[in-house]
């Protein structure tokens, strides 16, 4: 393939994966061994078109050392303009969560849910009922009281997240199958409801 491409043609590369946890210099060197073309990183780290009920705004890690090794780095956006401003700010700087929260007027309560919106690669510990309740207590601040254009973008994701937490709480409390089924069928698709009830 490398022999058939005009050497002046710029190659866009996402790393070793379509959504890469990191893009190390070693992987870039392997690509440069195959192609002499200019390379632009097309980074899907913040993209959410493959997981439309989620978004990620955590630190842009595992690829910052590449800026001088390639022609450019493009960030694949979410399509949510205010969210994308955060992603661009994250990729262009080392701002702390606190700085991001202040810059974009995000309520401090978001700190409790941020781990679930940080990265597609973050493994989080299981929650017990106390932990679920602690996160559910942020619902009113983030879904009812907070008013901004950013909140309007995040509202569907936050509501879905809290809905999933309510489901987890019901499962952990061993609610009867009838009660769980009645609750599920009004909130989740039929195939998912049947899968949850089967398990």
Residue ranges: model-predicted function:
Residues 1-97:
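Catalytic-core regions of glycoside hydrolase
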Residues 96-199:
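C-terminal functional modules
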């Amino acid at each position: 393939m490398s022999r058939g491409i005009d050497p002046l043609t710029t190659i866009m590369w996402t790393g070793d994966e379509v959504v890469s946890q990191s893009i190390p210099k070693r992987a870039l060197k392997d690509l440069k061994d195959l192609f002499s073309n200019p390379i632009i990183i097309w980074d899907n780290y913040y993209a959410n078109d493959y997981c439309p009920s989620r978004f990620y705004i955590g630190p842009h890690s595992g690829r910052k050392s590449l800026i001088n090794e390639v022609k450019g780095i493009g960030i694949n956006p979410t399509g949510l303009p205010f969210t994308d401003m955060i992603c661009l700010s994250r990729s262009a700087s080392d701002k702390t969560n606190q700085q991001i929260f202040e810059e974009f007027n995000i309520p401090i309560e978001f700190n409790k849910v941020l781990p679930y919106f940080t990265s597609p690669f973050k493994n989080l510990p299981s929650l017990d009922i106390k932990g679920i309740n602690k996160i559910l207590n942020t619902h009113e601040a983030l879904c009812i009281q907070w008013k901004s254009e950013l909140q309007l973008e995040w509202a569907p994701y936050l509501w879905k997240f809290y809905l999933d937490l309510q489901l987890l709480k019901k499962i952990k409390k061993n609610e009867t199958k009838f009660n769980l089924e009645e609750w599920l069928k009004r909130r989740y698709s039929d195939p998912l409801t049947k899968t949850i009830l089967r398990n």
